[in-house]
Amino acid sequence: MYSSSRKRCPKTKWALKLLTAAFLAASPAAKSAVNNAYDALIIEARKGNTQPALSWFALKSALSNNQIADWLQIALWAGQDKQVITVYNRYRHQQLPARGYAAVAVAYRNLQQWQNSLTLWQKALSLEPQNKDYQRGQILTLADAGHYDTALVKLKQLNSGAPDKANLLAEAYIYKLAGRHQDELRAMTESLPENASTQQYPTEYVQALRNNQLAAAIDDANLTPDIRADIHAELVRLSFMPTRSESERYAIADRALAQYAALEILWHDNPDRTAQYQRIQVDHLGALLTRDRYKDVISHYQRLKKTGQIIPPWGQYWVASAYLKDHQPKKAQSIMTELFYHKETIAPDLSDEELADLFYSHLESENYPGALTVTQHTINTSPPFLRLMGTPTSIPNDTWLQGHSFLSTVAKYSNDLPQAEMTARELAYNAPGNQGLRIDYASVLQARGWPRAAENELKKAEVIEPRNINLEVEQAWTALTLQEWQQAAVLTHDVVEREPQDPGVVRLKRAVDVHNLAELRIAGSTGIDAEGPDSGKHDVDLTTIVYSPPLKDNWRGFAGFGYADGQFSEGKGIVRDWLAGVEWRSRNIWLEAEYAERVFNHEHKPGARLSGWYDFNDNWRIGSQLERLSHRVPLRAMKNGVTGNSAQAYVRWYQNERRKYGVSWAFTDFSDSNQRHEVSLEGQERIWSSPYLIVDFLPSLYYEQNTEHDTPYYNPIKTFDIVPAFEASHLLWRSYENSWEQIFSAGVGASWQKHYGTDVVTQLGYGQRISWNDVIDAGATLRWEKRPYDGDREHNLYVEFDMTFRF
């Protein structure tokens, strides 16, 4: 496989040093005090004078296990690999310390007996499984044996737990043996100290430059314009390669940006450097993209287009990626479709990153067929597992996992959340060590309205990499839903400090900033053509409330105004309310206390309200409301001087976004001695969902009874309504946080009233709703209803409206 000269050639010397240096510090004898002749021999051996110790060991017939391990290590230091093997074979049945087996493993490796070396590494690791030096020794030997993929997998596992420069050097060594010289150069570049000069370059880095045809970069005097452009291009390419952290990628990109700035000054007005100047202009797009400067990428691209410069495919891909990150998915989709489709078929050689960008360019452009095409292509062309060369071990195929992750995401965006959940759960539980899949699963649970279940899954994911950016972003979203305001703020502050340009972080920060704004709520209705006895003709009902920004996380103050009027046979009724109060929001709890000055019939009377709810879990909620001078008293009653106090309680059961039911009971004690009891049951059953259309069945039952009969307001002795309805929500347009939809509703049922029998109830409604930039949510609905009142069917045509505005 490899010639024996590789044993001592320069390209492997540093790997050998990496191991033996670790073993020098591992000898327990070296840690003891100099208190006898044996210790003195060991210390001399550590200084390089190994012969006295080796002679002493050779003359001894009885040695302890620790002394045997010392012999093996010192023989290794002396370069006597065969002697190490001979000593080991003599004592192989002894239970040696791990350092002894490690010394033998190094000796076998030096003799190119890879399998024997791997066996000894396994013995050493069985005794000290967390020893990073032994793990690296095994990894380097796997690379020597040609098992590059296995070595890289193990190195990735080691690096996730203990990233350091030694791991980068090991990575470069593996890539060098595998012939992947660009990856080798990337790893060596990352291992360099910042601002290293050419005189300080280590031998391995110089060799990596040579392997990448960049040897001239070693000598500044040999830097021709073409070579300088090559170096700039190579730095840009390296900045896109996966590394241990974003900061390393940024550091490489910053080197490229600094080189561009210098070369741009030199070549801008030099006609002899036109070709090289155009090259660095294109490569500059990539460096800006790595640095998350998406708007700069786009503006630089537009300047190049104006000059007529031709942009090669890789440059166009960088621009498309910038458009996608800058929330311009249709432009990204247009460029990527040209690049990655050939006669409506996806190119077969796309990387995982290219597939992901193509997928999201379709998805975020609301092109669901295109997203499904990419998904099916990814799944159909990728086996679930990859078998590593030269070993029976197989590992999960990241591309296959990505394809099924696409499947879950498409289902989620297509409003098929059960399918999204099933796919995401299967992926997460079949790959428990994959943190990204666990985070995706939690995101689907959150979308289904189960934030506590999502929180539990994120806790499991936290074990793998606690400070993963995507993990903390998802945890912050869950905290916002659970009203854990302080936790959300801490997580958001952390990710903003670390990755301020990350699109997920930008989106989260926007949500937290909006949460901290003041809020205006307006809601009401106005009658157009009404015959009903409750609200009168041409009635108006309006409530306006302003909430303060959050105070000490959980508190908000509010103040507002309410107005209601209606025309009755006995005259016009008008009620004005001036109100103020406080709101408390914390995990599982919402409370609101309000004081109101109610003005009607030329009188001022104090009213009050206390409302609240408590969540037991993701499924069950109980709530209650107590009100003095209740708004449950009809306007007509107040016109006639009748007021009342009320109490209400309810229970809500929420299975998921497709099914929920609520039961409520209300009691109103009128000032004219009437007592009203109301019980209602309302539910929702989703019967159809697609990307743009959702249809729900809305069953509704209502029962009411009153103790007084002869009153100036509508007051049936007993009444019972059954009015099932359907509601269809049709998405007209959507772009990220902005949307516009229309809502149709229709219901037909029956109403029974004591002494008046049963008659038909019909309802129709049409409305539109718009959401904009997270700060505006507004809608209006035209409703028509016809129902019996004391045996006469009367109609009511009115408009409902509401708006929430953050400022």
From Swiss-Prot:
One of the GO biological process terms: single-species biofilm formation
Keyword Transport in record: yes
Its membrane topology: Multi-pass membrane protein
CC annotations in GO: cell outer membrane
Disruption phenotype: Deletion of pgaA does not prevent PGA synthesis but does block its export. The synthesized PGA is retained in the periplasm and accumulates at the cell poles. Disruption of the pga operon causes severe and persistent defects in the biofilm formation process.
InterPro entries linked to this entry: PGA_export_porin_PgaA (IPR023870), PgaA_barrel (IPR049003), TPR-like_helical_dom_sf (IPR011990), TPR_rpt (IPR019734)
Pfam families assigned: PgaA_barrel (PF21197)
Record's comment describing the protein's domains: Contains a predicted C-terminal beta-barrel porin domain and a N-terminal periplasmic superhelical domain containing tetratricopeptide repeats, which may mediate protein-protein interactions, perhaps with PgaB.
Name the record gives this protein: Poly-beta-1,6-N-acetyl-D-glucosamine export protein
Organism ancestry: Bacteria, Pseudomonadati, Pseudomonadota, Gammaproteobacteria, Enterobacterales
Gene (UniProt): pgaA
